[in-house]
């Protein structure tokens, strides 16, 4: 894309374009490890039967040479209890988390495009200070594909004319990405659902 022509006898027509230029592209991982102690009115854990974990409300924000992360880890677990009256118990809980990933050349002004996916997740029971299996240890590893863009502005030459000599501009088509909307808004939704008995 021609962006300058410094001959006095040549007339040029220019067009100002704004587009996104990729500044930083980095892949990294974020580990979320936390513990949860089950309530005292629940029986001890004999064995874990089934569990699922979700990362909710993940907020990734670039700052100076670092990306800060915060969100909530939601866990649902079925476990076998040592209590014979109720051999199968269920438990659902959420744990807030925060962390950070190093990202050289990142700044707050850059426009982030960060994709996060769960790479690994595990849940295990461990004994508390009394030796009873009452602590659940969750371990989740997120894979982050981080791209940071900067909005750039260039004057492109769209036409050239001179009466002195013949000018044949050569050009080619390029695909440029442009920022349409930059949105920082958040929306909190709450509702009540009635369950028929």
Regions found by a protein language model. Name each.
Residues 1-197:
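Viral structural modules
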């Amino acid at each position: 894309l021609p962006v300058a022509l410094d001959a006095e006898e040549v007339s040029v027509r220019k067009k100002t374009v704004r587009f996104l230029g990729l500044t930083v592209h980095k892949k990294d991982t974020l580990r979320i490890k936390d513990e949860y102690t089950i309530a005292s009115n629940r029986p001890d854990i004999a064995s874990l039967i089934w569990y699922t974990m979700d990362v909710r409300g993940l907020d990734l924000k670039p700052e100076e040479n670092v990306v800060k992360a915060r969100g909530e880890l939601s866990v649902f677990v079925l476990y076998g209890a040592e209590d014979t009256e109720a051999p199968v118990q269920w438990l659902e809980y959420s744990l807030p988390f925060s962390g950070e990933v190093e990202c050289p050349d990142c700044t707050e002004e850059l426009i982030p495009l960060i994709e996060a996916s769960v790479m690994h997740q595990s849940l295990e029971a461990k004994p508390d200070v009394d030796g009873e299996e009452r602590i659940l240890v969750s371990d989740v590893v997120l894979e982050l594909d981080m791209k940071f863009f900067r909005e750039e502005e260039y004057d492109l030459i769209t036409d050239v004319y001179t009466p002195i000599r013949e000018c044949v501009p050569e050009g080619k088509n390029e695909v440029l990405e442009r920022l349409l909307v930059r949105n920082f808004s958040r929306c909190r939704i709450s509702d009540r659902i009635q369950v028929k008995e």
